[in-house]
Amino acid sequence: LRPYFPLERVRDGAFAVAFPHLRPYLDPGPPTPCVRGDATACLLGGRFEVKVAWRTDTGTGTGKVMSFGGARAESNESVFWYFFNPENFEMGVKVLDACVPALGNRFWVFVSGLTNQGFTVTVRDSATGAVRTYSNPLGFYPQTVGDTNAFPCP
């Protein structure tokens, strides 16, 4: 005998379970401003929010923005990150405004690391809500990423 399933359950197809996880991608909601913090950099005048998550064999964590001589290691276009020791540079992220026809009318994102820890960089356009992620697997040295098609202008 086949088990009886109410019509609502069959028609739902368990989408009610999956939808809360998919909703941020289907309906990200209105864009929100970038808010600078220990684990958040705001580049190009706050247009782009940058965050880093790291992973090791024994755990996970959030990258922190470095400081050099008490000054935050963040300019308008770039930021340096540490994972474990505030004096040990792990990686850098740069976002450039290439919004001219000769350069393709795009914002560019560059990611480079000096670690074999796994990491994921998340860059969010606070004007549109668009998100790009760049990842490096645990145990591998990262190749520099140069994404010259990252976000549309303006």
Identify the meaning behind each predicted range.
Residues P28-P154:
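Polar/charged low-complexity regulatory segments
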